Regions:
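Residues forming the flavin
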Residues: 1-570
C-alpha cells in the first residue's frame, strides 16, 4: 500500500468532528442519541456531528474518513464504547484520513452511561452530554504526537533450564531464532529431575533425557550452566544482559526474555519433619519407591498429610499438584503391597480433570481418606525409637483417630526461592505477587506477558502447576516472544512522560514510583530523564512530581483541567 502522508495541523484552529454511536440498542436503547448529537453541535470548536448505528462498522469507518477530508476536520471525538476495545480501530481510520492518530478522544457513553444507568434514561442522556463535552474540551488542546521506531535484536534469552525453560527455548529455536538458555545449576532438567512419573503413569526420565539432548544438540541454542544473571539493561527488542558463567562475565544481547525459573518444595517446620528418616516429602518418596528403598519395602502402613504449608494464612494458595501426587504415591504403595494400610489426611481433595480417576481408583483399592480442618490439624509424635504416631480428629466421628504408620509423607507447598525471584524481578522490572511468584500482566488477556514489554513468564515461576501445563505455558510464552522477534522494528507509543528539566528538582520521587523502571536520575545534572522506549504512559510519575515538572503527553495538565472545568460546569 502507498505510504500515508500525515497532514500538519499543529498550528490550525481546532475543527472537531463528533461521531455519536447508537451501538444498536446498547446505547440508543437508553440514551437519547439524537439529543446528544444536537448538543454536541453547540460545543465550541465542533464543526460537524454524525450519528451512526454502529460507528465501528467498516462502512462507517469509510464514511468517517470521507467526512474528515470533506470537512477538513483536525480533531475527532467518538462517543461510543470503551477505548480499551475500539480506540486502535478509530485511530487507524484517522491515519487513513491523513491525521495524526493521537488527535482523537473517546467518550465512553456505553460503559459509563447506558449500561450503568439503564433504568434512568434522562440521567444517562445528561451524563452522555457531559462526557462528550469533556472529551471535546480535551481533544481541542491535543497536539500531534510522534512515535519511535526501535530496531529488534532477533534473539532470545531464556532464564531457567527446567522443562518449561527448555520447551520455550526449543519452540523459539525451531523457528530459527538464536536462544541463550541460562541455568544456575551445572545440569539441565530443573524440578523435572525429581519427578518419577506423570499423573497418568508415564515415566518422566526418558522424556526429560530426550528434551535435554534436543536442547544441547540444537544449533540455535547456547546453553550456559552454572550461570547467574547479574544485570539487565534495555527494553523490548534491545535488551543487554550480563551473565556470570562460573565466574566469567558475559554480555548477551537479545530482543525478548522468557523467565522460567523453577520453584521448590517447602521444607516444613511441623509434623516432625527432619526428626525421623521415615518422614518424607512427596518427591523424596518418589525416589525411595523408585530405588526400592528398604523403608518402603518393609512398610505395613503409610500416612499422607495434605496442604502442608499451603492454604494457610501465610500461603493461602493451593499448590495444585499435591493431591494428585499423594494419591499417585498411595497407589504405588498399594501396588507394591496390596495389604498395606494407606491413609490420606486431607482438607479438600483437588484432583483436577481426569485426575479424578486416580481418586476413584485409590478408593477402590482401599486407600482411606480422613478429612480434617485447619483448626484441628493432625498431630505427629516421634518416639525415641523412631516410631511414629499420628493423631487426627475425624470430622464424621468427631473423635480422634490414632495411626501408627511406618511411613509419613508430607505434601508440602510449592514455593518460590524469594531472593532469586526478587532479584530477577528488579533486574527485568517485572512484578511478583504476594506469594513471591511472578505476576502476569492480565490473567485472561495477557496470561504469559509481563507488564514490561518483551518479557514473558512460564512454568513454576508463574505459579504451581502440573508438567503438561508448564509445557503448554512455555510454548505460549515462546509464541508471544516470537511475535516480537518476527518484526524488523517496534513502534513505541506516543503517550509517554516528558521531564521539564528547568522545573525538575531531582527529588527522584518519579524514579521510585515508576513501575516500569523507565526513569533515570542523571547524577551530573541532578535531574531526572524518561527513557521513552520503556515508558508506558501510566502517568504515575506526573501525579507524583511535586514541582509538576513531568507532563504525560496526551494528558497534559491543561487538558485535564479543561475536562474538570467542563465536568463541573454542568
Amino acid at each position: 500500500p502507498p505510504e500515508l502522508t500525515e497532514k500538519d495541523v499543529a498550528a490550525q484552529e481546532p475543527r472537531v468532528g463528533v461521531f455519536v454511536c447508537h451501538c444498536g440498542v446498547n446505547i440508543a436503547g437508553v440514551v437519547d442519541v439524537e439529543a446528544v448529537a444536537d448538543y454536541a453541535q453547540t460545543l465550541p470548536g465542533v464543526v460537524h456531528v454524525e450519528r451512526n448505528l454502529f460507528t465501528c462498522a467498516q462502512d462507517t469507518q469509510d464514511q468517517m474518513k470521507q467526512i474528515i477530508e470533506e470537512h477538513n476536520l483536525n480533531r475527532i471525538v467518538v462517543a461510543a464504547c470503551s477505548p480499551r476495545t475500539h480506540e486502535a480501530l478509530f485511530q487507524e481510520t484517522l491515519k487513513q484520513a491523513g491525521l495524526n492518530k493521537y488527535l482523537f478522544e473517546m467518550a465512553n457513553i456505553r460503559n459509563q452511561g447506558s449500561w450503568v444507568h439503564m433504568n434512568e434514561p434522562e440521567a444517562a442522556t445528561e451524563k452522555a452530554k457531559d462526557l462528550v463535552r469533556m472529551a471535546v474540551a480535551k481533544v481541542a488542546l491535543q497536539q500531534p504526537l510522534g512515535e519511535m521506531q526501535l530496531g529488534v535484536t532477533k534473539s532470545a534469552l531464556v532464564v531457567g533450564g527446567g522443562i518449561a525453560g527448555m520447551t520455550a527455548a526449543l519452540t523459539l529455536a525451531d523457528q530459527g531464532y538464536p536462544v541463550t538458555l541460562v541455568e544456575q545449576k551445572d545440569v539441565l532438567g530443573g524440578h523435572g529431575r525429581k519427578l518419577y512419573s506423570t499423573w497418568d503413569g508415564q515415566p518422566v526420565a526418558p522424556f526429560l533425557d530426550e528434551l535435554i539432548k534436543r536442547v544441547e544438540a540444537h544449533p540455535e541454542i547456547t546453553v550456559l550452566t552454572r550461570a547467574q544473571i547479574t544485570d539487565v539493561q534495555g527494553f523490548v527488542g534491545n535488551f543487554h544482559t550480563v551473565v556470570d558463567v562460573a565466574g566469567e562475565r558475559r554480555q548477551v544481547d537479545h530482543g525478548v526474555a522468557v523467565i522460567a525459573v523453577g520453584a521448590h518444595s517447602l521444607k516444613p517446620a511441623e509434623y516432625g519433619y527432619g526428626q525421623s528418616d521415615r518422614i518424607f516429602l512427596n518427591l523424596d518418596l518418589d525416589q525411595a519407591i523408585g530405588e526400592r528403598d528398604e523403608r518402603v519395602a518393609t512398610a505395613r502402613s503409610a500416612v499422607f498429610i495434605q496442604c502442608v504449608g499451603s492454604r494457610e494464612p501465610d500461603r493461602p494458595y493451593c499448590s495444585r499438584v499435591c493431591c494428585s501426587h499423594s494419591i499417585e504415591n498411595a497407589l504405588r504403595l498399594k501396588k507394591l503391597n496390596p495389604d498395606m494400610d494407606v491413609y490420606v489426611l486431607y482438607r479438600d481433595i483437588r484432583t483436577f480433570g481426569l485426575r479424578e480417576n486416580l481418586y476413584k481408583e485409590a478408593r477402590a483399592r482401599g486407600v482411606l481418606f480422613i478429612r480434617f480442618d485447619l483448626e484441628n490439624k493432625p498431630v505427629v509424635e516421634v518416639a525415641s525409637d523412631g516410631s511414629l504416631t499420628v493423631t487426627v480428629k475425624d470430622h464424621v466421628l468427631q473423635r480422634p483417630v490414632v495411626l501408627k504408620p511406618d511411613l509419613l509423607t508430607l505434601a508440602s507447598a510449592i514455593v518460590m526461592r524469594e531472593s532469586e525471584a526478587d532479584e530477577l524481578a528488579k533486574m527485568f522490572k517485572v512484578p511478583v505477587n504476594a506469594e513471591g511468584f511472578f505476576l502476569e500482566a492480565h490473567a485472561k488477556l495477557r496470561p504469559v506477558d509481563f507488564a514490561t514489554d518483551g518479557v514473558f513468564v512460564a512454568g513454576l515461576a508463574h505459579y504451581p502447576k502440573p508438567t503438561e501445563e508448564c509445557i503448554a505455558q512455555a510454548k505460549a510464552a515462546a509464541s508471544r516472544a516470537a511475535t516480537v522477534l518476527a518484526r524488523d522494528s517496534i513502534t513505541a507509543g506516543g503517550v509517554v512522560a516528558l521531564v521539564n528539566k528547568d522545573l525538575c528538582c531531582g527529588c527522584q520521587g518519579c524514579v521510585q514510583c515508576c513501575p516500569f523502571g523507565a526513569i533515570d536520575y542523571l547524577e551530573q545534572e541532578g535531574k531526572c530523564e524518561v527513557n521513552q522506549a520503556l515508558c508506558k504512559g501510566c502517568g504515575t510519575c506526573a501525579a507524583t512530581c511535586p514541582s509538576e515538572a513531568i507532563t504525560l503527553l496526551g494528558f497534559s495538565h491543561l487538558q485535564l483541567y479543561a475536562q474538570i472545568d467542563e465536568a463541573l460546569s454542568a
